[in-house]
Amino acid sequence: MTNIRKTHPLLKIINSSFVDLPAPSSLSSWWNFGSLLGVCLGVQILTGLFLAMHYTSDTTTAFNSVTHICRDVNYGWLLRYIHANGASMFFICLYMHVGRGLYYGSYMYSETWNIGILLLFAVMATAFMGYVLPWGQMSFWGATVITNLLSAIPYIGTDLVQWIWGGFSVDKATLTRFFAFHFLFPFIVTALVMVHLLFLHETGSNNPTGIPSDPDMIPFHPYYTIKDILGFMIMLTALSTLVLFSPDLLGDPDNYIPANPLSTPPHIKPEWYFLFAYAILRSIPNKLGGVLALIMSILILAIVPIIHMSKQRSMMFRPISQCLFWLLVAVLLTLTWIGGQPVEHPYIIIGQMASILYFLIILILMPITSLMENYLLKW
C-alpha cells in the first residue's frame, strides 16, 4: 500500500517539499538560514498577533499601551522583547542568507533570487513600520525623516509624502495606517516565501561547489531535518539569551521617551539592521541622489546575476573573489558603524569612502576579478 503522505492531496505537497525532497549531499551550515528565517517569521507572526491584542494605534495611547503590555499583561514583557529582538535575529539570518547566495552563486536561479529581493524589501518595510508603533521619540522622528525622503521625488514628491502621512505631519492617521500595514505585510511575506520555495523546488538547491549535484542527492528527511533542528536550537538559545539578559542591547534608549514633535533627538538613527543603508543615504549631499543610492544599495542585488562573469558558479575555488567578498563584508560592517555615528569629521569621509567601495566592489571589481580568474584557469 502506498504511504498516505504520497497520495493525500495536502500531505503530498508537504512531503515533496520537506520529506522526500532530493537535496545535494554536500550542503553546509550556510544552507540552514532559509529554515531559520521560516522559524523567525513564525515567531514574529505569533508574538505580533498577541501584542496586537493589547496594543492601541492611537497617538495618545500607543506609548502607554506598550508600557501596559510590559507591566500588566501576563508575560507581556516577554512577548514584546521576543518580538523586538526577534526582528534583529530575522535580519541577522536574512543577511547571512543573502551573503550565502552571493558567495556560492545561488543568484543564478534568477526567479528564486528575484523573489528573494522582493522579500527583502517587504521585510524591511515591515520592520520600519513596526519600529514606528511604540510611538517613542525615535519612532516618531525615524518615521518623519524616512517618509520625508519621498519628497525628493520630482513633481509628485510633496503630495506623495502628505498622502502617506494622511495629513501635514506624522500624526494619528500615519500611526493607524502603519499599524494596519505592519499587521498585513507578514502575511504577504508568507505568501512570497511560498512562491520563493516553489521556484527553488523547480530547480533544486545549489551546493557549495556550484557543480550540478543530480547524481548525488539524498532525501531531505531525516538528514537535513535533523540539521535544521540543530540550527533552530542554536538560534532560539541565542534569542532567549538576548531577550532574558539584555533585551535593550540593540534598541535605542530614546524610544523610552514618548514621542514629542517639539523636541528633536540629538541623533536620529534607525534600528541597527538599517544603519548600512542609512550611512549610504547620508554619504551623498544631494537629497534625491541619497534616496537613489539608498534604493540601489539593495536593488544592486538584482544586477548581480547579469554581471556574473566567472566560468565557475561558486566562489569556493576562486580565492581572489573570496578576498573581495570578505572585503565587501568588512565594508558593510564599516557602513553599519558609520550609520550610528554623528555627521561630523572623520565619520563623513569614512562613510563616503565605504559607500564608494561598496558599489565599486560589486559593480566593477567582482566582474574584473572573475574575468582574470577565467584567464588564470587556462594556465
Swiss-Prot record:
It comes from the Eukaryota. One of its GO terms (cellular component) is mitochondrial inner membrane. InterPro entries: Cyt_b/b6_C, Cyt_b/b6_C_sf, Cyt_b/b6_N, Cytb/b6-like_sf, Cytochrome_b, Cytochrome_b_C_euk/bac, Cytochrome_b_N_euk/bac, Di-haem_cyt_TM. Keywords: Electron transport, Heme, Iron, Membrane, Metal-binding, Mitochondrion, Mitochondrion inner membrane, Respiratory chain, Transmembrane, Transmembrane helix, Transport, Ubiquinone. Its cofactor is heme b. It is a multi-pass membrane protein. PROSITE patterns: CYTB_CTER (PS51003), CYTB_NTER (PS51002). Heme b b562 binds at H83, H182. It is found in: Mitochondrion inner membrane. The chain crosses the membrane at residues 33-53, 77-98, 113-133, 178-198, 226-246, 288-308, 320-340, 347-367. SUPFAM superfamilies: a domain/subunit of cytochrome bc1 complex (Ubiquinol-cytochrome c reductase) (SSF81648), Transmembrane di-heme cytochromes (SSF81342). A ubiquinone binds at H201. GO terms for biological process: mitochondrial electron transport, ubiquinol to cytochrome c. Heme b b566 binds at H97, H196. The keyword Metal-binding applies. Binds 2 heme b groups non-covalently. GO terms for molecular function: metal ion binding; ubiquinol-cytochrome-c reductase activity. Its main location: mitochondrion. Belongs to the cytochrome b family. Component of the ubiquinol-cytochrome c reductase complex (complex III or cytochrome b-c1 complex) that is part of the mitochondrial respiratory chain. The b-c1 complex mediates electron transfer from ubiquinol to cytochrome c. Contributes to the generation of a proton gradient across the mitochondrial membrane that is then used for ATP synthesis. Heme 1 (or BL or b562) is low-potential and absorbs at about 562 nm, and heme 2 (or BH or b566) is high-potential and absorbs at about 566 nm. The cytochrome bc1 complex contains 11 subunits: 3 respiratory subunits (MT-CYB, CYC1 and UQCRFS1), 2 core proteins (UQCRC1 and UQCRC2) and 6 low-molecular weight proteins (UQCRH/QCR6, UQCRB/QCR7, UQCRQ/QCR8, UQCR10/QCR9, UQCR11/QCR10 and a cleavage product of UQCRFS1). This cytochrome bc1 complex then forms a dimer. PANTHER family: CYTOCHROME B (PTHR19271:SF16). This is Cytochrome b. It comes from Ectophylla alba. The gene is MT-CYB.
